[in-house]
Amino acid sequence: MMTTRRHILCVWLFINSSIFIKRAAAFSTAAKQQAVIPPGILGPPEPLKSLQVGQTLNAFRLVVDDDDDRVDFSIERVANSPHIFLLRNFLTSSECNQIQALAEEGGMKTAETVTKGDTSSRKNCSVAWIPSSGPDGSSLVSGLVASTVNIFLSDVVKSRPSAGVENMQILKYGVGGEFVHHQDGDARVFTVIYYINGVGGTWFPLADRNDGEIPKNKAGVLELVENLEPGKHGIFLKGDSSNSAQEGNNNKHTVLVNKGDAVAFYNYRDEGSAQLDWAALHCGSPTDETKWIANHWYRLNELANY
């Protein structure tokens, strides 16, 4: 019964999410006006909120410019703190190839972080940006935004004037490429990482940590994770096609991902403090093969005031 209800919900909201996408084209200046962030809106809405680790919901999204009218996928909770969900088969193989082609056609540059000129935090990596909406955007990309917004953002967040989505970031990592530990933050309330060629390596070292408190600042968490290891601590999303994919997979800390899968997670605490959730600290581990991923960041700009 839950599955049927989810299907109906996805279709209706997909059609009505265009309001969010249009607003995303230019973030509202209303973000500068501090507003109260009540508890229970920065995390997952129902029925995702009640999903237990290991439990799965079936869903679908509508497809634009494709012979098929929908893509069926599943949503599995893989961690409670932070809220992390794995979307199995969210993208078709054809859509993955299309995203990769969009990046190559548009030209790729050496990737930087939010700090202009910083190429040391992200190594051996090229980047391209694809508009998430507007006349220069891709119908595939805007469709992914619509589907994701519908499922993962609360009605309150979607209705806020300062809500929006950044352009899709497409990344190509060469052998040895990596991205050091970081928290997406900066008013990015929610993140989706798409696995374009099935090479994973996303590690959340503090996910579902039950061994002491997590510090509430960057310096503290970076010191804490120094002695932790992927596959032994936190949650490690590992490419099923990786050369080392068969090593150390039979434990609760490792989740295998394939081409077309995506991981979705929340970056802020949801108890009313509107503070960063440092359990969402993550990194892109050094890769032993070429790795293609794409990112979408969903913003609530008023969070910058807290």
Report the location of each language-model feature:
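Classical eukaryotic N-terminal signal peptides for Sec-dependent ER targeting/secretion
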Residues: 1-10
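Fe(II)/2-oxoglutarate oxygenase catalytic core
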Residues: 9, 14-16, 20-23, 27-306
